[in-house]
Amino acid sequence: MNNQCGTSPIVGFRFTLSPMTSDFVSVIKGALNETDLQNVWRHTDDVSTVIRGRSEHVFDVAKAVLSHATKTGTHVSMSGTFSVGCPGDTMGDNLLDVTSEPANGKVATQYVSSQFALYPLGDLNYMDIIYEEIDFAKARGVFNESMHYASGIHGDIEPVFSFYEATFDRVRAKTSHVVMTVTFSVNSPSHEGRHDA
C-alpha cells in the first residue's frame, strides 16, 4: 500500500452505467464489449465497473463506453468517480506500460449534460483551484450553470470529455491527491434533441 499522496501515476474511474430501459443488461454489456479496453485494467461487479491506467486511456475508455451505450437513442446516465494519488491505493491492477495513443479515439456527435464536483484533497487553497477550473470551463465554452454541490457542464461529448480530462490533469499537476465526481445524462427527453452547448 502507498502511504503518501501523489506518488502513484495510476488514474482510476469507478462508474455505474444506468440505461433507462428494461433491456439495460444488453446495453451495459454491449457498451463494454464494443469499447477497446486494451490499455486499461477493468473489473466489473454487481454494482459498478472500475478502470485503471494512464489518464489519457481512462478518459478515452470512459467516453467510448458512454458513447456506445447511448447510440441507440436510449436515455442513459453514467455516474462515477475519477481519482489519482490516493494514499490507500496500490500499484497492482493497472496497465501503465502501454502506448500513449488512445485505443478508441473520437466518437460520434452526441449532446451530453453533466455535473461535476472537484476535490483537490489536502490543498489549503482548494477553493481557488476549484474556481480556476470553473473559469476554465467557461473559457472552453462548456460551462452550463452553477448549482448546489456541483457545477454543470454540457455540450458535444468530445469537448465535454476534453474539458474533464484537461481539468483533471491541470489540478493533478498542482495537487497530489485529486478526486472528481461526474454524472452524465444523454438522450434525456428534456434535452430536446440538442447537439451542442
Residue ranges and their predicted role:
Residues 1-197:
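Charge-rich, low-complexity N-terminal segments
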